[in-house]
Amino acid sequence: MAVVSGDPDKKGGIYVIRIRTKGEVTVRPHWHPTEEHITVLAGSFLLAHGDKYDASKLIELKPGAHSVVPATMRHFGFHKAGNVIEIYGEAPFAINWVNPEDDPNRPKAK
């Protein structure tokens, strides 16, 4: 993730972040406290709403596509290899996982 503009951690400011993926990445169900605007710049990104991951619900967004995810709406996604998306909105940018065990930054149990 690269910050393009603003500070995603500074409350009340506007931020723009860019995410590039090399391989395929599954994004488990989560939500954000603020509205999220997603634009596909390259490749494909698949998105769906709901609190349970269901690949059959994913809708493919191609370059130039834009989607708005309202604050607190549960959603999930799938990055195809080599895609680039840009996300902007009002900070702070925070990810709240529907299932905390899905958080990729969570320490692994020993």
Predicted regions and their residues:
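A short glycine-rich, His/Asp/Glu-containing loop-to-beta-strand
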Residues: 1-29
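Divalent metal-coordination and catalytic microenvironments
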Residues: 4, 64, 85
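Short acidic-glycine-tyrosine-enriched beta hairpin
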Residues: 7-9, 24, 45, 51-72
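Glycine- and acidic-residue-biased ligand/ion/polar-headgroup-sensing regions
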Residues: 22-25, 31-52
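Histidine-centered active-site/metal-ligand motif
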Residues: 30-32, 74-75
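Active-site scaffold segments
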Residues: 37-39, 68, 84-88
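Double-stranded beta-helix
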Residues: 56-57, 76-110
